[in-house]
């Protein structure tokens, strides 16, 4: 896990984004998914230029307000701070509905339920300290192995969602050394 911390800490843009998100003081907020995954994949492929962000996934957890409009308001606040970043904000207290799960207990639980393991990662700055959450194999992540999380594996009844996502994303074109595991 130290290697992941070191990658994030050494990237001033990533730290800046994490600090901007922290400044909003959203409950249980993190930056997740491709923001971190792509940095790791770029590094293991030896890329010196960063893959541009499709979006920066900001997540938070507020079970008392499931109205999607609040997410748009937070996106606007982030754009007001820095409009050059493609912000995407989602309340994880309502995202369980997307894949017919029980309501998540917090943001980390939601991240653990992401489709594939390398995407099920999040980071934040909290009280000036970097925190990273990743519940899957760090060795697999650092070796470019893409596999479904337990919630989308062959026995889950949702494996087709994983396969559809892998086919749609076409990650092997950007990162040809990835290994896809079932």
Q: Residue ranges of each PLM-predicted region?
A:
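Catalytic cores of the polymerase beta-like nucleotidyltransferase superfamily
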Residues: 1-182
């Amino acid at each position: 896990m130290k290697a992941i911390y070191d990658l994030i800490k050494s990237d001033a843009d990533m730290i800046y984004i994490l600090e901007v998100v922290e400044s909003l003081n959203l409950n249980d907020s993190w930056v997740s998914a491709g923001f971190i995954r792509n940095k790791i994949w770029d590094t293991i492929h030896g890329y010196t230029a960063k893959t541009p962000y499709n979006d920066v996934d900001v997540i938070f957890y507020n079970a008392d307000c499931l109205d999607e409009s609040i997410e748009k308001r937070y996106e606007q606040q982030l754009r007001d701070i820095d409009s050059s970043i493609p912000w995407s904000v989602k309340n994880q207290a309502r995202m369980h509905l997307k894949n017919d799960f029980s309501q998540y207990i917090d943001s980390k639980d939601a991240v653990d339920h992401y489709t594939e393991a390398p995407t099920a990662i999040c980071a934040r700055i909290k009280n000036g300290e970097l925190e990273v959450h990743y519940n899957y194999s760090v060795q697999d992540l650092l070796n470019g192995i893409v596999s479904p999380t337990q919630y989308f594996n062959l026995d889950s009844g949702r494996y087709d969602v994983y396969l559809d996502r892998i086919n749609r994303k076409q990650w092997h074109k950007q990162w040809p050394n990835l290994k896809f595991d079932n």
